[in-house]
């Protein structure tokens, strides 16, 4: 239920951002606002149900001073509807809309050792060509894969790791015996 509500809020803000042709600005600003709101001291006040809504709204105006009125007002609407605890989920849903709008995908690149920039660029180029999307690589080091690469694209895993090859070989050997 909370995800559905977060999607509605994100969609509403995204529609406004598109109409104003400020999708990137709204995304960056919402990301920064949520980062500030999630700092421990601010978060305790922001989600505290015993604090009056009007006091919270005033607090948000002070904490988000310098942010656009649209983002501040959006956060205030979330407060007025008692949805402040969903602000991170709203950002996640907005980010999904943002990435779809700009034809982007995230790809986790798992390797046994840190990859050089040239290798990452080559992987990015190949994936952008294959998926016809802008690729954002998220490099992760996991020594357990021993070598090779493992790519995670959404729910798809492309496992070219040495560990996976050894496990497949072991499985084949067991079946042969």
UniProtKB/Swiss-Prot annotation:
Pfam families: OSCP
Record has Cell inner membrane as a keyword: no
Intrachain disulfide bonds: none
InterPro entries: ATP_synth_OSCP/delta_N_sf (IPR026015), ATPase_OSCP/dsu (IPR000711)
Superkingdom of the source species: Bacteria
Gene3D superfamilies linked: N-terminal domain of the delta subunit of the F1F0-ATP synthase (1.10.520.20)
Cellular compartments annotated: Cell membrane
GO molecular function terms attached to this record: proton-transporting ATP synthase activity, rotational mechanism
Keywords: ATP synthesis, Cell membrane, CF(1), Hydrogen ion transport, Ion transport, Membrane, Transport
Subcellular location, principal: membrane
HAMAP family for the chain: ATP_synth_delta_bact
Function text: F(1)F(0) ATP synthase produces ATP from ADP in the presence of a proton or sodium gradient. F-type ATPases consist of two structural domains, F(1) containing the extramembraneous catalytic core and F(0) containing the membrane proton channel, linked together by a central stalk and a peripheral stalk. During catalysis, ATP synthesis in the catalytic domain of F(1) is coupled via a rotary mechanism of the central stalk subunits to proton translocation. This protein is part of the stalk that links CF(0) to CF(1). It either transmits conformational changes from CF(0) to CF(1) or is implicated in proton conduction.
Quaternary organization: F-type ATPases have 2 components, F(1) - the catalytic core - and F(0) - the membrane proton channel. F(1) has five subunits: alpha(3), beta(3), gamma(1), delta(1), epsilon(1). F(0) has three main subunits: a(1), b(2) and c(10-14). The alpha and beta chains form an alternating ring which encloses part of the gamma chain. F(1) is attached to F(0) by a central stalk formed by the gamma and epsilon chains, while a peripheral stalk is formed by the delta and b chains.
PANTHER family assigned: ATP SYNTHASE DELTA CHAIN
Family stated for the protein in its record: Belongs to the ATPase delta chain family.
Name the record gives this protein: ATP synthase subunit delta
Origin species: Caldanaerobacter subterraneus subsp. tengcongensis (strain DSM 15242 / JCM 11007 / NBRC 100824 / MB4) (Thermoanaerobacter tengcongensis)
């Amino acid at each position: 239920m909370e995800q559905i509500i977060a999607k509605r809020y994100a969609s509403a803000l995204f529609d406004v951002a598109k109409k104003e042709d400020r999708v990137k600005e709204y995304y960056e600003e919402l990301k920064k606002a949520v980062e500030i709101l999630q700092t421990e001291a601010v978060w305790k006040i922001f989600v505290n149900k015993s604090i009056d809504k009007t006091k919270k709204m005033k607090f948000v105006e002070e904490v988000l001073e310098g942010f656009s009125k649209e983002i501040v007002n959006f956060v205030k609407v979330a407060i007025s509807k008692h949805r402040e605890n969903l602000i991170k989920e709203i950002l996640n849903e907005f980010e999904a809309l943002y990435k779809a709008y700009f034809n982007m995908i995230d790809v986790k690149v798992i390797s046994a050792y840190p990859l050089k920039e040239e290798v990452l660029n080559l992987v990015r180029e190949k994936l952008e060509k294959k998926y016809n999307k802008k690729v954002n690589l998220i490099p992760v080091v996991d020594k357990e894969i021993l070598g090779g690469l493992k790519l995670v694209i959404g729910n798809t895993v492309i496992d070219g790791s040495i560990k996976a090859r050894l496990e497949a070989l072991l499985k084949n050997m067991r079946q042969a015996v």
